[in-house]
Swiss-Prot record:
Region annotation Repeat 2: where it falls in the sequence: 84-147
Entry binding sites for ATP 1: 207-214
Taxonomic source organism: Corynebacterium glutamicum (strain ATCC 13032 / DSM 20300 / JCM 1318 / BCRC 11384 / CCUG 27702 / LMG 3730 / NBRC 12168 / NCIMB 10025 / NRRL B-2784 / 534)
Domain Clp R: residue ranges: 1-147
Entry-linked InterPro entries: AAA+_ATPase (IPR003593), ATPase_AAA_core (IPR003959), Chaperonin_ClpB (IPR017730), Clp_ATPase_C (IPR019489), Clp_N_dom_sf (IPR036628), Clp_R_dom (IPR004176), ClpA/B (IPR001270), ClpA/B_CS1 (IPR018368)
SMART domains: AAA (SM00382), ClpB_D2-small (SM01086)
Coiled coil: 393-527
Domain notes for this protein: The Clp repeat (R) domain probably functions as a substrate-discriminating domain, recruiting aggregated proteins to the ClpB hexamer and/or stabilizing bound proteins. The NBD2 domain is responsible for oligomerization, whereas the NBD1 domain stabilizes the hexamer probably in an ATP-dependent manner. The movement of the coiled-coil domain is essential for ClpB ability to rescue proteins from an aggregated state, probably by pulling apart large aggregated proteins, which are bound between the coiled-coils motifs of adjacent ClpB subunits in the functional hexamer.
Subcellular location: Cytoplasm
Annotated spans, C-terminal: 757-852
Similarity comment: Belongs to the ClpA/ClpB family.
Protein name: Chaperone protein ClpB
Species lineage: Bacteria, Bacillati, Actinomycetota, Actinomycetes, Mycobacteriales
UniProt keyword Repeat, yes or no: yes
GO CC, any one term: cytoplasm
Length: 852
């Protein structure tokens, strides 16, 4: 034993054997203990070696455990630390000799297995009787460890390294587990051209996230399987290397490098038969480097890449390629760039049509072609931060998922009936305890009603179950059809043309006819409780859920609401018909789809004296659209008086404090692209601030400090100003031309001038202000009644042409609010009381008192 040099796994097996013998009460450790310990290792090499000899390792393990259980038991002080018996020591000696023959520096578990088989023990007999003889085990070594020698204490991590740390894409394609790739022929052809070169045959796919870089490699795998590639790639294996699993669990320095070296040696040993794919290629830069070492994965593969010994396909985004790969010129020159651009909307629709059947089978629903068109068009218009076709595929996937959830959930009609039945059952239990005649009569009626409702419920449940079963049957048939098509393709590749003919001209057409009949039965039922078809409206609902933008068709209620928008806004903003009409027209244009899709929904400059409703109209629009007057982005331009403050809107430039935080305007719009943006008191801002708004007003876009494009096409931009207040319309327009550059004014949809408020209009504003005060008092259940004479008194004293409606708000606060607060604190008015406001002292003041 002094010369026995075990690997880490062998050492672990010896410790496990000792533990087994000790816990079983065996006086010594025998080869059966070692055999059981070796085969119990989850990531050991002995089990794959046995499988290569045609023996089931689980069966051997079970038999070895039976042998251990049959050994004699003893008790005493030495039982805690049993020794290896002669047979076990002979096995170690045989294993050490075999390791020397193989040129191994350490004894690994599969060599110890051969040592056990060579001896004369019950464990050796067990292996030999099952067919795992010493010679058979020895011959099986190359299938697991190749031509590698054991030169480290952890060689098992290097055996079958390619199988452990990669995924065989060609195998997945052969099994039909890869989605079809539509289009991208030019990019795939370019990848094949680069792979066919003699040296530097390493294409790298670069493009924005979500444009289909990984899909191109999967498309190449499908083509290799179909034989639709040049001779230089026919029959090759395309594997996807998983650097994450290679790094995971590498505890000691150099362990990652050992694993990577084993993978590279295995690829090199395949003599060009293996093409390697690394997704997120930039991760190889720095992977495995530790401390002072510069030997990362990128540097390890450079020589192989240059010599053409490693055919590598990479995929990474533009930013990460620039950040990691381009910095290392020696690594960059070994790759050939293949740029993958974003597909057009038409191309994206083609891609969706190719994937449609896969998603129909997975979700068990049908997807209309018009829904695919809507997904491509709506995602292109409204989801600007992501790229086609990924965002369109996600829309279709989520819409189908939403529909499937509705099919699996109980319909609304059944839910409502179940609630009614539960309520009636509770009433029945309560009435059954009463003994008076009225209660008994009511109980009889209730039982009759309950029986009717239960019957209705059972009918509805039966209908729902039948419809659900019909939809599920179609889904199962589609799954079977896909499996048969995959089987047909495999049979064709294997040359089994009899089976191909049987499937393609027999079972597949028969199943297609059954699916067609089943789907037509589902369609015939017009009063169906369930819908199993994804429509453009379903897609639009998902877009609305993602972005908050109402992209779907307008319902009847919304149409009427939009047609009456002036009246709704006019109830809150009095006497400004021109402004209300301009904003209402902009919103209607947007919802009807006739607005320019490349500009904001509307951009307005509101001019007029203070207190006439400029800011109030912006709040009213926000309340109309979002049912909350605070649901808008408000930028107080008085805070942007200095030139440098423009950076606060779009975010600080690189190198400045706050660069990573984004801008106050751009971040807010990025989070809520469908909103009202109010720039209040614009004349107080520095003139340079308006230069950044030029692109927003004209193109509906703005680039923030981090280079991201923010979409303003679904916003309503409102700028308010007091410029020229008090002058005529012409004087106000002249003041605007003096204050703002012509290119800024020219980009606005409209410059709306607010008129001064008349005394008559102030009377209407009194009602609005009183209603707001009443709403604030609702929490204390106070019923506020203001007499007509008190309203007239407020309108008369609150009118000031120079200050608009704001003096009226202050007057209501002083004349009613202050007095009411004192009455509440004194206890003269309590929660739930009525409060009367009337004129007192001959019209000198208002009296606020508890209503009798």
């Amino acid at each position: 034993m002094s010369s026995f040099n075990p690997t880490t796994k062998t050492n672990e097996a010896m410790q496990a054997a000792l533990q087994q013998a000790s816990s079983a009460g065996n006086p010594d450790i025998r080869p059966a203990h070692l055999l059981a310990a070796i085969l119990e290792q989850t990531d050991g090499v002995a089990a794959p070696v046995l499988m290569a000899t045609g023996v089931d390792p689980k069966e051997i393990l079970a038999e070895a455990k039976k042998l251990v259980a049959s050994y004699p038991k003893a008790s005493g002080a030495n039982m805690a630390n049993p020794n290896f018996n002669r047979d076990a020591l002979n096995a170690f000696t045989a294993a050490q000799e075999l390791a020397g023959e193989l040129g191994d520096e350490y004894v690994s578990t599969e060599v110890l297995l051969a040592g056990i088989a060579r001896g004369k023990s019950d464990a050796a007999d067990l292996l030999t009787n099952k067919g795992a003889t010493y010679d058979a085990i020895k011959e099986a070594f190359p299938s697991v460890r190749g031509s590698q020698r054991v030169t480290t204490q952890d060689p098992e991590g290097q055996f079958q390294a390619l199988e452990k740390y990669s995924t065989d894409l060609t195998k997945l394609a052969r099994e039909g587990k890869i989605d079809p790739v539509i289009g991208r022929d030019q990019e795939i052809r370019r990848v094949v051209q680069v792979l066919s070169r003699r040296t530097k045959n390493n294409p790298v796919l670069i493009g924005e996230p979500g444009v289909g870089k990984t899909a191109i490699v999967e498309g190449l795998a499908r083509r290799i399987v179909a034989g639709d590639v040049p001779e230089s790639l026919k029959g090759k294996t395309l594997i996807s290397l998983d650097l994450g699993s290679m790094v995971a669990g590498a505890k000691y320095r150099g362990e990652f490098e050992e694993r990577l070296k084993a993978v590279l040696d295995e690829i090199k040993g395949a003599n060009g038969e293996v093409v390697t794919f690394i997704d997120e290629l930039h991760t190889i830069v720095g992977a495995g480097a530790s401390g002072e070492s510069a030997m990362d994965a990128g540097n390890m593969i450079k020589p192989l890449l240059a010599r053409g010994e490693l055919r590598l396909v990479g995929a990474t985004t533009l930013n990460e390629y620039r950040k990691y790969i381009e910095k290392d010129a020696a690594l960059e020159r070994r790759f050939q760039q293949v740029y993958v651009g974003e597909p057009t909307v038409e191309d994206a629709i083609g891609i969706l049509r190719g994937l449609k059947e896969r998603y129909e089978v997975h979700h068990g629903v049908r997807i209309q072609d018009s829904a695919l068109v809507a997904a491509a068009e709506l995602s292109n218009r409204y989801i600007t931060s992501r790229f086609l076709p990924d965002k369109a595929i996600d829309l279709v996937d989520e819409a189908a998922s939403r529909l499937r959830m509705e099919i699996d959930s109980s319909p609304q009609e059944i839910d409502e009936l179940e609630r009614i039945v539960r309520r009636l059952e509770i009433e029945e239990m309560a009435l059954s305890k009463e003994s008076d005649a009225a209660s008994k009569e009511r109980l009889e009626k209730l039982r009759s009603e309950l029986a009717d409702e239960r019957e209705k419920l059972s009918e509805l449940k039966a209908r729902w179950q039948n419809e659900k079963t019909a939809i599920d049957d179609v889904r199962e048939m589609k799954e079977e059809l896909e499996a048969l098509r995959s089987e047909s393709d495999i049979a064709e590749r294997d040359g089994n043309y009899g089976r191909v003919a049987e499937l393609r001209y027999g079972r597949i057409p028969e199943l297609e006819k059954q699916i067609e009949d089943a789907e037509s039965k589902v369609e015939v039922n017009e009063n169906a409780m369930l819908t199993e078809e994804v429509t453009p409206d379903t897609i639009a609902d998902v877009v609305s859920a993602w972005t908050g933008i109402p992209a779907g068709k307008m319902m009847q209620g919304e149409t009427e609401k939009l047609l009456n928008m002036e009246r709704v806004l006019g109830n809150r903003v009095v006497g400004q018909l021109e402004a209300v009409t301009a904003v209402s027209d902009a919103v209607r244009r947007s919802r009807a789809g006739v607005a320019d899709p490349n500009r904001p929904t509307g951009s307005f400059l509101f001019l007029g004296p203070t207190g006439v409703g400029k800011t109030e109209l912006a709040k009213a629009v926000a309340e109309f659209l979002f049912d909350d007057d605070r649901a808008m982005i408000r930028i107080d331009m008085s805070e942007y008086g200095e030139k440098h403050s423009v950076a606060r809107l779009v975010g600080a430039p690189p190198g400045y404090v706050g660069y990573d935080q984004g801008g106050q305007l751009t971040e807010a719009v990025r989070r809520r692209p469908y909103t009202v943006v109010l720039f209040d008191e614009v004349e107080k801002a520095h003139p340079d601030v308006f230069d950044i708004l030029l692109q927003v007003l004209d193109e509906g876009r703005l680039t923030d400090g981090q280079g991201r494009t923010v979409d303003f096409r679904n916003t309503i931009l409102i700028l308010t100003s007091n410029l020229g207040a008090g002058g005529t319309r012409e004087q106000m327009m002249d003041a605007v031309k003096m204050a703002f550059k012509p290119e800024f004014v020219n980009r606005l949809d409209d410059v709306v001038i607010f008129d001064r408020l008349s005394p008559e209009q102030l009377t209407s504003i009194v009602d609005i202000q009183i209603k707001q005060l009443t709403d604030r008092l609702a929490g204390r259940r106070l019923n506020l009644r203001v007499s007509d004479s008190a309203k007239a008194w407020l309108a008369e004293r609150g009118y000031d042409p120079a200050y608009g409606a704001r003096p009226l708000r202050r007057l209501i606060q002083q004349a009613i609010g202050d007095t009411l607060a004192k009455e509440l604190l004194a206890g003269n008015v309590r929660d739930g009381d009525g409060v009367l406001v009337d004129v007192a002292d001959g019209g000198q003041k208002l009296d606020v008192s508890r209503a009798v």
